[in-house]
Each structure stands twice: as structure tokens, then as C-alpha cells.
Amino acid sequence: MSHLDNGFRSLTLQRFPATDDVNPLQAWEAADEYLLQQLDDTEIRGPVLILNDAFGALSCALAEHKPYSIGDSYISELATRENLRLNGIDESSVKFLDSTADYPQQPGVVLIKVPKTLALLEQQLRALRKVVTPQTRIIAGAKARDIHTSTLELFEKVLGPTTTTLAWKKARLINCTFNEPPLADAPQTVSWKLEGTDWTIHNHANVFSRTGLDIGARFFMQHLPENLEGEIVDLGCGNGVIGLTLLDKNPQAKVVFVDESPMAVASSRLNVETNMPEALDRCEFMINNALSGVEPFRFNAVLCNPPFHQQHALTDNVAWEMFHHARRCLKINGELYIVANRHLDYFHKLKKIFGNCTTIATNNKFVVLKAVKLGRRR
């Protein structure tokens, strides 16, 4: 846990999933402080919109203004709810919207934590363009190293005149005034042909490797299991290309597409509808934090390309949670398959959790591993 003192309220905040006490990561950053400082003497009129509030620092601080928290992360929503409870704040003080929803009209203040991808930022700025006014105070913040010329140009192109502040505690802010510059329409998704198939893959703005097949998935697809039955999971499904391949290779199986990103799950659904509509009755689509709340001993196999970062921080906490959830939800003799960068050494992590691990394939960058649920373990 970490403490954030600001002009609105003193907060105790924690990350979600929780980090270990040996090497804890903080649940807020200097950019959060810097953004809140700008509102110290501001009379807030109209709705408050907060975009990409990773663990709820801004939403908790501004809870008395009944803000809207907007983003593409179910984990961030869970973190914000947890931190509201931790600080004795009514959860109903914050309204949660995903990035594809309609934003409230004529907001008084918009606070943006700059996301990792310009594509998501552009989608969000285009959505804001439909609702903000010249009187709306628009402020964005991030680590100084994450604000680039391209970031500023995007604000200018979509919303209007843009300036930046000096760095403070290695954070910078962007101030923007809406003046409705001319702007051409943009498609909601980008699409590309998947080589070796007749499939067209469609990706929403926040999907990993949006403009082409990432090399880890490409390697994984060469070593996916075939002729499985029962239910199998594409965990952290992204655009669903692994799940699509599983549907093709396992015609007797049902595939459950799971991701914490609403845009990822929407992309997966769209890609099944576009490329294998006849298989829709063998699909389930789930926005979730890994397999939280899913009954144990349900699945025959889980397949996963786990992330090793959360927002801008490098961490294996999300991967650890995925592995533990997979073990809980697998049937006895059910199998977990993962692809990962070799340097992450997930072999020993899986062996610790499952009691076994087998290397299926390896190259100079990636490894495909399999672990089997052999019986009940603590």
C-alpha cells in the first residue's frame, strides 16, 4: 500500500492485483499528483471525466464530484472499486464506462492519463471531441518520457491548441483547449489478412499488436493442441487469433475468449463473426480479471500468452494470477499451454504451481510450455 496526500483528501492506495511486500510497486504516480494540483483552486462545473485511471487515484481523490471513470481495463475498474472501499468512499460515487461507450455531454473537467498506445489515445480524443466545449478544462498527464511530439500533435489535430508544462517529479502535463479543428473520419477498427489463411483480422484501438500478427502469437500458433474436446480457454485473448485457430483445430471443442480489455473481447467476437460465423455457437466471450469467479475443474485446456507488464510497469503479477487461476479452473489432467519470452523463466514458475512443466518448443526468443493439473495441490 502507498499513501497519496493531495488537496482533496488523504488516500491509502494499493495496486490490483496486489504486489509483494519485497518489491512493491506504487498505486499512483507523480502525474496523478500533478493533475490534482491543477484543480486545487478550480470551481468544477459540469461532469468530471477521468480517462485511464489505472488504480483509481484520481477517481478516489475527486469522488465528491461524482466522476466518470472511463477506460479499457476491467482490472483498473476493480482496482478503483477496491481503493474506494479501502478509503471508506461509497463505490456509487464513481460511474464506470468503457472507452467505446458514449461520454457524458459538456463536461466541466477532463483528466487524461496518457495511455501506452497512440491508437487508444486517438480513439478517446475523438470520443471527447463529440462532447467537450471550449470551456471544458482538458488536462492530460504522464511521465515526461512518455509524452512525445506525436502525443502533442494528436491533441492538436483532434481537439485544438495544446501546450505542455515543465517537468515536475519527472512528470509533465498537457493542457488543451477545444476549438473543433477540421478532422476526417476514422474507422473504428483496423484490419489485415492473416497469412496462410483466408481470415481477415479486425482490431479495436487498444488491442496488442494492432496492425499485424505479433511474433509470439505466430510461434504459438505453430504448436497449438489439436482434436481437444470440452471447453478450452483463450486467456488474455486479445484479438482472438489464438482462439480462432483453436476453433479450427478442435472442431469438437468450445472456446472461451477471456480478456480484461472490453476492446479485446469485442475484437475477438468480431473476428469470429467475420471469419468463422458457423462456430459462434461454440464460443463464449468474457470480460474478466483472468478467471476470477469461474468455477473450479471446468476446463480441459487453457492457452495463454501472458503479459509481463501492467500499464507502464514491468511486473509478473498478472501472469502469476493467470497461472494460479488456470490451475484452479482446469479439470484433473487438464493442460495449460503458454508462450513467453525465454528470459522470463516461466518454466520454474509453472513447475512450482503445477508440480510439472514440459517444454513443447523453443526458438531464440520464445518458448512454448505445457503444465498438467495432476491432482489437488494446496
UniProtKB/Swiss-Prot annotation:
Pfam families: MTS
Single GO term (MF): nucleic acid binding
Subcellular location: Cytoplasm
Known catalytic reactions: guanosine(1835) in 23S rRNA + S-adenosyl-L-methionine = N(2)-methylguanosine(1835) in 23S rRNA + S-adenosyl-L-homocysteine + H(+)
UniProt enzyme class: transferase
EC number: 2.1.1.174
A GO cellular-component term linked to this record: cytoplasm
Function: Specifically methylates the guanine in position 1835 (m2G1835) of 23S rRNA.
Family statement: Belongs to the methyltransferase superfamily. RlmG family.
Name assigned to this protein: Ribosomal RNA large subunit methyltransferase G
Gene: rlmG
